[in-house]
């Protein structure tokens, strides 16, 4: 199995778990004694944590000099913590579980992207097309998860998440054991990036795009259920947006070459 295919397989599992968690986990949290306001607050706090957790995991991988064991550890911990939602009840208990799980899961997509971008840099794959595989996996579980959750109840959502994250950890040894191309930068050197105006603009654009999605990520499933829609329909509504994302990734390479990264990012924001 080629290195790009091995990374794509693991990435598929990571994004598939996200399809269950993002679409159906809020439905379970709504049965754990939480209001919609409390759920949005918990997701907001976990998002703040991820701001520090993501670069921290990257720093660990840099210092260790290997990406694969860090990704496997994070996937296994995320799988175990997913089961913690089942006994959790009330704001503080759910906050504790979601905080710990968010810290661990913050490593997964960025480290998969690190491996993909390294292979793309070597000319061994088209990043956008392979990344579209992840979006497709999200789409499949978002749609297929609806009948499962409808049949077994929303408590099945964290169980499905745990199973898929465990599969990602089990597939982890297939990953190429990538090592840094150069000496890891110092922490001070990382902060010097903030003096780069292009980097600051990129971070600002990313922050605006991601924050605009916050309410949609945390509350859309609850809103649609309150409107009387079933789990299968909710999954299909999520899938509609992911189809657009997948098409965007498929054509990101040619569009980026024609428009440039700035216009491409702006198109993504639209």
Which ranges hold each PLM region?
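Juxtamembrane intracellular "pre-TM" segments in multi-pass secondary transporters
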Residues: 1-2, 172-208
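Helix-loop boundary and gating motifs at the non-cytosolic
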Residues: 1-47, 199-237
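Helix-loop junctions at membrane interfaces in 12-TM secondary transporters
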Residues: 2-4, 85-98
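Residue-level signature of mid-helix packing/kink "hotspots" within the transmembrane helices
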Residues: 47-55, 138-139, 143, 242-250
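Helix-to-loop junctions at the C-terminal end of transmembrane segments
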Residues: 52-66, 149-150, 247-261
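Structural signature of the two symmetry-related core transmembrane helices
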Residues: 69-83, 162, 263-270
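Cytoplasmic helix-loop-helix junction between adjacent transmembrane helices
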Residues: 97-133
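Symmetry-related core transmembrane helices of the 12-TM Major Facilitator Superfamily/SLC fold
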Residues: 156-173
């Amino acid at each position: 199995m080629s290195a790009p295919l091995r990374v794509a397989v693991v990435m598929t599992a990571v994004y598939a778990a996200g399809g269950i968690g993002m679409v159906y986990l809020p439905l379970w949290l709504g049965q754990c004694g939480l209001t919609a306001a409390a759920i949005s607050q918990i997701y907001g706090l976990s998002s703040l944590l991820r701001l520090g957790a993501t670069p921290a995991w990257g720093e660990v991988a840099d210092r260790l000099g290997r990406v694969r064991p860090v990704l496997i550890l994070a996937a296994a911990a995320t799988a175990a913590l997913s089961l913690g939602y089942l006994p959790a009840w009330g704001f503080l208990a759910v906050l504790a579980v979601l905080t710990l799980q968010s810290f661990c899961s913050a490593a997964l997509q960025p480290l998969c992207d690190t491996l993909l971008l390294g292979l793309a840099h070597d000319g061994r794959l088209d990043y956008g097309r392979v990344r579209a595989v992840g979006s497709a996996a999200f789409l499949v579980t978002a749609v297929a998860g609806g009948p499962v959750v409808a049949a077994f109840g929303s408590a099945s959502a964290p169980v499905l998440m745990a199973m898929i994250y465990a599969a990602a950890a089990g597939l982890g040894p297939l990953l190429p054991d990538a090592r840094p191309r150069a000496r890891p930068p110092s922490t001070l050197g990382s902060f010097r990036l903030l003096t780069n105006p292009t980097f600051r603009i990129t971070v600002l654009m990313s922050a605006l795009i991601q924050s605009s999605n916050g309410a949609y990520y945390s509350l859309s499933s609850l809103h649609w259920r309150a409107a009387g829609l079933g789990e299968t329909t909710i999954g299909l509504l999520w899938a509609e947006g992911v189809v657009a994302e997948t098409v965007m990734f498929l054509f990101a390479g040619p569009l980026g070459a024609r428009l440039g990264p700035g216009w491409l990012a702006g198109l993504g924001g639209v």
